[in-house]
């Protein structure tokens, strides 16, 4: 999965759940800028966040 796909999936899941980038950043303990970069494909989330994201978004 490429960066764009990861970002689109993350963005879509966040919108379905009805939360902001700021709210997700608080859950994960990262900056809002990090969430934005993940969603825009500029960066990947560290692999350690994937299990947390999976649990959070079910």
Each model region followed by its residue ranges:
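DNA major-groove recognition helix of helix-turn-helix/homeodomain DNA-binding modules
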Residues: 48-58
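A short, Lys/Arg-rich alpha-helix, primarily the initiator
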Residues: 1-16
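Short alpha-helical DNA-recognition segment
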Residues: 18-37, 52
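Residue-level signal for the short linker/turn that defines the boundary of a DNA-recognition helix
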Residues: 8, 18-19, 45-48
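Short, conserved catalytic or interaction motifs in soluble domains
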Residues: 40
């Amino acid at each position: 999965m490429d960066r764009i796909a990861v970002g689109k999936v993350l963005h879509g899941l966040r919108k379905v759940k009805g939360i902001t980038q700021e709210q997700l950043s608080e859950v994960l303990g990262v900056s809002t800028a990090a969430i934005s970069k993940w969603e825009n494909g500029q960066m990947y989330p560290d692999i350690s966040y994937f299990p947390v994201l999976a649990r959070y978004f079910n």
